Amino acid sequence: MLYYLFDYLEKLQLPGARLFHYVSFRSAVAIILALLLATVIGNRIIERLRKAQIGETIRDLGLEGQLSKKGTPTMGGLIIIISILIPTLLLARLDNVYILLMIVTTLLLGSLGFLDDYIKVFRKKKEGLHGRYKIIGQVGLGFIIGIVLYMNPAVVIKENSEVLRDGQVERVHFNKQEVKSTKTTIPFVKNNNFDYADILPFEGKTKVLFGWILFVCVAVVVVTFISNCANLTDGLDGLATGSSAIIGVVLAIFAYVSSHIEMASYLNIMFIPGAEELTIFAFAFVGATIGFLWYNAYPAQVFMGDTGSLTLGGIIAVFALIIRKEMLLPILCFVFIIEGLSVMIQVFYFKLTKRRTGEGRRIFKMTPLHHHFQKPGNAGIDAWLQKPMQAIPESKITVRFWLVGIIMAAITIATLKMR
């Protein structure tokens, strides 16, 4: 909104009005505004949640300090959502299809998570919204994102190709024509590009059509999987929040370089016109998560609940799909993914051993993975992995997972120059 106001003021030759044409300036304002909003309104929202007795119910899992969290206000994800949307609405161009997709993602998954938390708190159902309805919402969002990226004429890229001399890359050439494409960025392959349509045994228009169908299916899987993994990661104070902030910084960098033709050429990644506006959203995302961490760090004054965790995971997934970096998510979202996979592996192994031996066995002492480190070894739990033998304090687990996230974020950026 402010973009259009200052665009008008620039026509009136108001000094300084042109600043709002610079993405870097609007991004800086976005992160500061989001950070201030989260910290200022956060305290007020927490007080209202506490007065309304919207607190977390705790199931005793025998973890140190767990019962002290009982009654801590939940649904704090509202703080994150508000702190993302207000800077985005004020500073980004609202005629940009990518910004509209991110706003829809935030509102849709925020509503889904809010409904889940509402059922848990007010209807006293610990399981919350039935899992099938969560999946329907996530699959529906992934389908919408995939279809819009396919059908909207504004969603285009400029394909890149390497110019070689003596077997070495001399420069990267971008085709002048903007095209619809099912290509995505992936390291270690020619031109850092991978086309979904290339793996299909078709030719011509049929190949293009089925390439987009495959892309839509990938979008559904990515949104559903990453959103649920982020939800499972939200089990320790500050863990999901800090991890999301780290990921958000990398996504902001990717959005900026993907929309800057010289930087895209240097990194040999596809050029995506219009993606520069996503930098503003990403900085608002980072500011909101860091601001929320002010209250969510150990010992937490508020939990984000599914209102926040489902939204954070969905935002990350959709953002990556838009800038064609979904193939880098296994590295970038490593912490989220190992948390999610630990649950899947545990359930699969337990059911397999129960069917074969009549008694279910575990690989981890407890899942998601962060709980495994909270349990001491040889504590009466029949698990294949008993180490560490001493329980690790919650705050130390969180910081170590953040450090892993930072390392994986650095590796993700480095892959763009790997040939």
From Swiss-Prot:
How is it placed in the membrane, per its record?
Multi-pass membrane protein
Keywords, alphabetical: Cell cycle, Cell division, Cell inner membrane, Cell membrane, Cell shape, Cell wall biogenesis/degradation, Magnesium, Membrane, Metal-binding, Peptidoglycan synthesis, Transferase, Transmembrane, Transmembrane helix
**Which residues does UniProt call coiled coil?**
none
Q: Where are the transmembrane segments?
A: 22-42, 72-92, 99-119, 135-155, 208-228, 238-258, 278-298, 303-323, 328-348, 396-416
What is its cofactor?
A: Mg(2+)
Asked whether the UniProt record includes Cell inner membrane among its keywords, one would answer: yes
Pathway connected to this protein: Cell wall biogenesis; peptidoglycan biosynthesis
GO process annotations (BP): cell division; cell wall organization; peptidoglycan biosynthetic process; regulation of cell shape
Which reactions does this protein catalyse?
UDP-N-acetyl-alpha-D-muramoyl-L-alanyl-gamma-D-glutamyl-meso-2,6-diaminopimeloyl-D-alanyl-D-alanine + di-trans,octa-cis-undecaprenyl phosphate = di-trans,octa-cis-undecaprenyl diphospho-N-acetyl-alpha-D-muramoyl-L-alanyl-D-glutamyl-meso-2,6-diaminopimeloyl-D-alanyl-D-alanine + UMP
* Subcellular location as annotated: Cell inner membrane
Pfam families from the UniProt entry: Glycos_transf_4, MraY_sig1
Q: Annotated Gene Ontology MF terms? A: metal ion binding; phospho-N-acetylmuramoyl-pentapeptide-transferase activity; UDP-N-acetylmuramoyl-L-alanyl-D-glutamyl-meso-2,6-diaminopimelyl-D-alanyl-D-alanine:undecaprenyl-phosphate transferase activity
RNA-binding recorded as keyword = no
Look up the EC number in the record and give it. Answer: 2.7.8.13
User: Per the similarity annotation, which family is this?
Assistant: Belongs to the glycosyltransferase 4 family. MraY subfamily.
How is this protein named in the record? Phospho-N-acetylmuramoyl-pentapeptide-transferase
What are the top taxonomic ranks of the organism?
Bacteria, Pseudomonadati, Bacteroidota, Bacteroidia, Bacteroidales
